[in-house]
Amino acid sequence: PPLILRDVFPSIEQVQDLLTTHAPYTPLGGWYNPGADPHAKSRPMWFQNDWVHDTYIAEGSEIFLNNDTYIEQSKAFYNADIIEPHSVYVNIMALINDGGPAHTDNSRFHGRERANTPMWLLRAMTWSHLFNAYEIVQATAIWWLDDVEGGGLLYWPDGPDHPPTEHVGDMKNTALLGDNHGMFHQVGPVGPFDNGTVLVTPSAQLLPTQDNTWVVIDHEERIYEAPLNAYRVSVLWKANVY
């Protein structure tokens, strides 16, 4: 089963500052629907941004990328000699009553990854088992900024035929570290729950205001506004394992 790490950072203020510095955030989903109508409200309020990928490292994101706790715990979890961090990205969510789909993360192969290969093709390569010899084992850590209404993570450490475990409540400044490429996991419903799931267009943006709140703006319309600690904020870290 994955490891739950607590009190990952001495202070979460440095992460809050990073989130502000690297705003705005845009809706998840462009990779599978690049020709989507930019005026159709088809996306949940699930916003994302890359802080580290193959050609880019956002200033300050090294606190995640080179996190000693993640690296040492990954070595122990996998009994590995080398942990090579390569990706950090942010998910910010609100008003998603149904949560997300149960899934495993996309695999990474020698020469093939999400930077140069469509996600659907990576999934086909994974589930065909024809490319197992070329797959690079991945360690994943998911860190949460705060406790919010709902927003738990369900995961299936014993396989999808067994009941899931849920990490919910007391999530602030914790991280779940393990194999999200082999273990099914799912974001639970995310509140607030008064108005159901609110959809936005692919052009929507989430960004901070001068009043210390965060606002979703969609074609100049203010869709939702709340303090940052009312949003479900998670930061994902991934590393090659050798």
Report the location of each language-model feature.
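Active-site rim elements
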Residues: 57-62, 127-130, 162-164
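A structural signal for short, well-ordered beta-strand segments
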Residues: 88-90, 141-143, 235-239
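Catalytic core of Fe(II)/2-oxoglutarate
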Residues: 137, 148-242
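Short, surface-exposed, charged loop/turn segments at secondary-structure junctions
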Residues: 51-53, 104-110, 156-161
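Charged, glycine/proline-rich intrinsically disordered loops and linkers
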Residues: 32-42, 103-105, 109-127, 194-224
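Short, conserved beta-strand element in jelly-roll/cupin
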Residues: 112-114, 119-149, 177
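Non-heme Fe(II)/2-oxoglutarate
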Residues: 1-80, 89-93, 97-100
